[in-house]
Structures are given as structure tokens and as C-alpha cells.
């Protein structure tokens, strides 16, 4: 990210554990520790105040703060960004790591014997609110506050999942949110890079031994199929320290490997491509100015 005379500032969302043990290892917790060890100032964000306060005991007091907030609540999340900017005067990176899995069953097997008029309740879509809306909210807030950095711009790295590409049948809604995140990132990346000097990319972990994964599932997996958190941290570092201008990249973190995933080729060539090429009058009508993309249709 170039040279800096002041420590860089990162917001790490999803920094608290989902278990009763507030310091049980998780991607957000380990990411916060890793960034602090490299000299970053880190704003840790999570829903659990007690877990956040416990986390701070394991971080440098002069470089880490905790902010209790729900990323699916725009006002709460915006308040965090505002407080961080007022505290440190800049936001260089958003690590959008908050995430949960399905909290209800879409398959409703327990309702097989219900009468036709006994309609099941709506599914709990908290997973959509946190995993997808939280990323969209965080991205918009990052755009706003990174415009006010001493050198405008910054980095956004999102924790996705390999389930976005190869869906897990146990968690269909979770995998749907992660697939949506991938396409959202690819959709906004060119404009953020060109107009805002912001790069947005995604890391996709496989099975990581964290609180979001049931311990019984970990026990049922052979060791070579487990991805160490350290591999995910390498993925984050790849994007946070990139000097080549990567944007819209999707990076699988699998065991000890980092693997890039690319967009498929258009099935019907230029006809398929034309359907998703920016038409400038529509872009201006939707967003207030032209995109300026090199392949846009005037």
C-alpha cells in the first residue's frame, strides 16, 4: 500500500467469538491480532460487548479499540466508522469478516405432516442481513470515509466462503449470501478502483476450525482438508499489501494454498457480454454521473 508516515487504520468486523469463550480463535480475532502485530491501529467490531472487552486484553492498548455494533444495522455501523475516523483521522482498510450460517431450516422437514393451510413461518434470514447487507453497508460507508483520508482511497477485503462457488447443502442460504458477495465485489470493483482509489477483493476460506463450524464437523474431516487460520491471514495480507492494483479478485484459501478464481467465459460470446455492458445514459440516470468505464456504451 505504499509508504506511510503514520500507522494504518483498519476496521475488522466480526471480531468477537460466537461462543461463550470470548477468546476462542476465530478469523476476526486472529486478524485483529495479526494487524496489531504489524503496526496497524485496529477497530474491532462485534455484537458482544463482553467478548470485545476480553479481546482487548490480548491486544496493544494503544492500537486497539472495540466498538459494539451489528453490521446489519446501518446506523450502528455508520456510528463505528464515524468514531474511528474521529479517533484516528483515517480509515485505510475495512476487513468485512462478520458472518453467520443459516439459523433456520429452509427444508422445513418438521412440517411434513402439516395441513395445506398450516403454512410454516417465514425463515429467519439474519444470515442475509449480516453476510450480504453487512457487506453492502460496509462498502458504502468505506467509500464515504475513505474519500476523507489524507490520501483518498483504501482497501476492502471481504471474508467469503468456498461455499459461494461449490454450495454446501446444509447451509443453502449461507452459500447464497456468499455467492451474492462474490458478484457484488466483482460488480463494484472497477468503479471503486477507477473513481475512488479503493480496491475491493474477497478471500474464500474452506473448512477453518473456528466457532462458526461445529466441532463435530471438524472432527469428521481428515486433517489435510482443514484450512489453518494462518492461510486466511495470508489471503488478507495478499490484498492489504498488494502493490499491483488487484481489484475484484476472488481468492480461495484452501489448506496451505491460495487459489484465484476467475469469471467464466460468456456462454454466447459478445451477445452474452452485451447484456451486462454499461450503457452510460442508464448509469448516469441511476448514479448521477457517467461510469467512465473503457468498455461502456455512450
Curated annotation (Swiss-Prot):
Active-site positions on this chain: 174, 178
InterPro entries linked: NAD(P)-bd_dom_sf, Sc_DH/Rdtase_CS, SDR_fam
UniProt GO BP: secondary metabolite biosynthetic process
SUPFAM superfamilies: NAD(P)-binding Rossmann-fold domains
Sample GO molecular function, one term: oxidoreductase activity
Gene3D superfamilies from the UniProt entry: NAD(P)-binding Rossmann-like Domain
CDD domains according to UniProt: ADH_SDR_c_like
PROSITE patterns: ADH_SHORT
Coiled coil residues, start to end: none
EC number(s) per entry: 1.1.99.-
UniProt induction comment: Expression and the subsequent production of PR-toxin take place under static culture conditions (oxygen limited), whereas no expression of the PR-toxin genes occurs under the strongly aerated conditions required for optimal penicillin production. There is a negative control of the transcription of the PR-toxin genes by the penicillin biosynthesis gene product(s), or by a regulatory peptide encoded by a small ORF inside the penicillin gene cluster.
Binding site for NADP(+): 27, 70, 97, 174, 178, 208, 210
Claim: NADP is one of the keywords in the record: yes
Biological pathway: Sesquiterpene biosynthesis
Keywords of the record: NADP, Oxidoreductase
One annotated Gene Ontology cellular component of this protein: cytoplasm
Stated family: Belongs to the short-chain dehydrogenases/reductases (SDR) family.
Function in brief: Short-chain dehydrogenase/reductase; part of the gene cluster that mediates the biosynthesis of PR-toxin, a bicyclic sesquiterpene belonging to the eremophilane class and acting as a mycotoxin. The first step of the pathway is catalyzed by the aristolochene synthase which performs the cyclization of trans,trans-farnesyl diphosphate (FPP) to the bicyclic sesquiterpene aristolochene. Following the formation of aristolochene, the non-oxygenated aristolochene is converted to the trioxygenated intermediate eremofortin B, via 7-epi-neopetasone.
Protein name according to UniProt: Short-chain dehydrogenase/reductase prx6
The species this protein was found in: Penicillium rubens (strain ATCC 28089 / DSM 1075 / NRRL 1951 / Wisconsin 54-1255) (Penicillium chrysogenum)
Annotated gene: prx6
Amino acid at each position: 500500500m505504499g509508504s506511510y508516515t503514520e500507522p494504518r487504520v483498519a476496521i475488522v468486523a466480526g471480531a468477537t467469538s460466537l461462543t461463550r469463550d470470548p477468546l476462542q480463535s476465530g478469523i476476526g480475532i486472529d486478524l485483529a491480532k495479526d494487524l496489531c502485530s504489524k503496526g496497524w491501529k485496529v477497530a474491532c467490531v462485534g455484537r458482544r460487548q463482553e467478548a470485545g472487552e476480553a479481546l482487548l486484553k490480548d491486544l496493544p492498548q494503544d492500537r486497539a479499540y472495540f466498538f459494539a455494533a451489528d453490521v446489519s444495522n446501518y446506523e450502528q455501523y455508520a456510528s463505528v466508522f464515524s468514531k474511528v475516523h474521529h479517533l484516528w483521522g483515517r480509515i485505510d482498510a475495512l476487513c468485512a469478516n462478520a458472518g453467520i450460517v443459516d439459523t433456520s431450516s429452509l427444508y422445513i422437514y418438521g412440517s411434513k405432516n402439516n395441513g395445506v393451510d398450516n403454512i410454516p413461518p417465514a425463515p429467519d434470514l439474519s444470515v442475509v442481513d449480516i453476510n450480504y447487507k453487512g457487506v453492502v453497508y460496509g462498502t458504502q460507508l468505506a467509500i464515504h470515509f475513505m474519500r476523507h483520508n489524507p490520501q483518498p482511497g483504501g482497501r476492502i477485503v471481504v471474508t467469503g466462503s468456498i461455499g459461494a462457488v461449490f454450495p454446501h447443502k446444509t447451509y443453502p442460504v449461507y452459500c447464497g449470501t456468499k455467492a451474492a458477495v462474490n458478484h457484488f465485489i466483482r460488480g463494484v470493483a472497477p468503479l471503486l478502483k477507477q473513481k475512488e482509489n479503493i480496491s475491493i477483493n474477497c478471500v474464500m476460506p474452506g473448512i477453518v476450525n473456528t466457532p462458526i463450524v461445529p466441532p463435530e464437523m471438524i472432527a469428521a474431516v481428515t486433517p489435510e482438508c482443514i484450512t489453518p487460520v494462518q492461510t486466511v491471514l495470508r489471503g488478507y495480507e495478499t490484498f492489504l499489501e498488494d502493490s499491483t492494483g488487484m481489484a475484484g479478485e476472488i481468492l480461495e484459501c484452501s489448506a496451505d494454498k491460495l487459489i484465484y478464481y476467475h469469471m467464466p467465459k460468456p456462454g454466447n460470446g459478445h451477445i452474452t457480454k452485451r447484456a451486462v455492458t454499461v450503457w452510460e445514459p442508464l448509469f448516469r440516470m441511476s448514479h448521477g454521473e457517467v461510469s467512465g468505464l473503457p468498455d461502456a456504451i455512450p
